[in-house]
């Protein structure tokens, strides 16, 4: 039995025993905190970690030396002082996460894609496989492609299971039913899908909402660290709009599983359009791709949309996104009116999301801006509606369309690496 008193990890044994906290639990917590600091700040010295965690230097040295021996973190050299003359005393040795300690497989299943790939712990892309899908693609096609791609990625990169942290699955909410995922009180139950995948692999598995995963990827995989960045709002465009807001870089639980609630926000109460739920002028009936196409169909004609009409050879069924973009640039009056109107409504939505969640950044994902000029038009619209402050907070997602599997990677890395203090996960899940 441990004697009462403080241990080197900053805990009191008597308190720990009374409250069911084991030495291993405390060790894991401290390792988690070390990894969290390194993730947030990048290379940091032991003395700075000790100061942040309010632990002794000796305690931090013991913790970090063990993690270095295990290959989880590494020393990367001395701290370079900006001033010419460095202060006297012991030099600061910087440590950082060894982002090649293990590799991660990510799988993201969304309405138009199955994306499978391999990354480092920092989200650097090493390999990928993508399959375009639509509403007719069945479960077997998705499952078979996923299994084949995982095996190919492991084989092509000569990786055994000891090199892999685990597999993260990011599933878009509208894909739940197609993959056999039931939802009760907003909570998805991944048990059936997990059981099917467990028959194919012994690797640790993580399942969650792909919107949440992509939001986390936009925090964790930033190449330039910002120690003051603690919360973002993340808006994903698609047939349904999805939203995640974070606090201290973790998703706020109440938003976690109902990411599509933003669809029901009213942004145009005087609209002629109502959606099936009965709401007038909600996001779903004003801003989604189907809403845009519905508006364009109503005005499609040789008189009102001459360029679009000619490009589509007189049939609206031939209209695609490239034609719409060209029609806008060629000054098809009705097309410009509709798209500019939607730009204003999106600005209203972004203004309201900003003031209701107070994020440091609003990150837009899957919005199809053709170029920087098109994105600037949105920022100008936001400036006009909500002011320069709100406009300055808007940025585009860092996750490329072809790398959507990084959503799954981010989910796995958080759960299996950071939340476990780097402890081996092979005996779990």
Question: What spans do the regions from the language model cover?
Answer:
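ATP-binding/phosphotransfer module of carbohydrate and carboxylate kinases, centering on a glycine-rich
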Residues: 1-76, 81-89, 96-130, 138-151, ...
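Conserved phosphate-binding catalytic cores of ATP/NTP-utilizing and phosphoryl-transfer enzymes
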Residues: 75-102, 207-233
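Short, acidic Gly/Pro/Ser/Thr-rich loop/turn segments
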Residues: 112-114, 174-176, 242
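Glycine/GP-enriched mid-protein hinge/lid loop-to-helix segment characteristic of carbohydrate kinases
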Residues: 128, 198-326
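Glycine-rich phosphate-binding loop and adjoining helix at the ATP-binding site
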Residues: 129-151, 155, 161-231, 373-384
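Structured loop/turn residues at beta-strand edges in well-structured enzyme cores
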Residues: 162, 260, 357
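Glycine-rich beta-strand-to-loop/alpha-helix junction loops that act as flexible
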Residues: 167-173, 237, 362-368
């Amino acid at each position: 039995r441990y004697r009462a008193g403080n241990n080197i990890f900053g805990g009191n044994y008597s308190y720990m025993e009374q409250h069911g906290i084991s030495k291993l639990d405390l060790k894991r917590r401290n390792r988690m905190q070390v990894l969290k600091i390194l993730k947030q700040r990048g290379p940091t010295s032991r003395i700075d970690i000790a100061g942040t965690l309010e632990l002794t230097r000796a305690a931090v040295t013991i913790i970090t030396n063990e993690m270095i021996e295990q290959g989880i973190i590494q020393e990367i050299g001395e701290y370079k002082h900006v001033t010419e003359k460095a202060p006297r005393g012991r030099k600061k040795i910087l440590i950082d996460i060894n982002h090649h300690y293990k590799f991660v497989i990510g799988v993201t299943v969304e309405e138009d894609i199955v994306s499978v790939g391999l990354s480092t712990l920092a989200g650097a892309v090493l390999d990928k496989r993508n399959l375009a899908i639509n509403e007719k693609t069945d479960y077997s096609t998705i499952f078979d492609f996923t299994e084949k791609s995982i095996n190919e990625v492991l084989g092509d990169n000569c990786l055994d299971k000891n090199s892999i942290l685990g597999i993260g699955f990011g599933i878009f909410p509208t894909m739940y039913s197609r993959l056999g995922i039931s939802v009760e009180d907003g909570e998805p139950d991944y048990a059936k899908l997990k059981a099917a995948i467990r028959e194919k692999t012994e690797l640790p598995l993580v399942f969650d909402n792909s919107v949440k995963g992509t939001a986390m990827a936009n925090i964790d995989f930033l190449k330039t660290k910002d120690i003051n960045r603690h919360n973002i709002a993340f808006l994903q465009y698609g047939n349904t709009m999805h939203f995640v807001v974070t606090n201290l870089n973790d998703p706020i639980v109440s938003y976690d599983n109902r990411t599509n609630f933003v669809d029901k926000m009213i942004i145009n109460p005087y609209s002629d359009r109502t959606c099936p739920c009965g709401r007038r002028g909600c996001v779903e009936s004003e801003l989604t791709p189907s809403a845009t196409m519905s508006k364009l169909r109503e005005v499609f004609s040789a008189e009102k949309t001459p360029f679009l009409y000619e490009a589509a050879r007189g049939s609206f069924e031939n209209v695609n996104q490239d034609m719409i973009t060209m029609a806008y640039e060629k000054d098809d009056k009705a097309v410009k009116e509709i798209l500019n109107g939607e730009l204003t409504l999106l600005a209203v939505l972004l203004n309201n999301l900003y003031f209701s969640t107070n994020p440091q950044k609003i990150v837009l994902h899957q919005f199809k801006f053709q170029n920087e000029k098109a994105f600037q038009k949105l920022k100008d619209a936001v400036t006009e509606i909500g002011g320069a402050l709100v406009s300055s907070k808007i940025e585009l997602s860092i996750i490329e369309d072809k790398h959507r599997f990084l959503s799954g990677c981010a989910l796995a890395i958080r759960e299996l690496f950071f939340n476990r203090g780097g402890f081996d996960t092979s005996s779990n899940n």
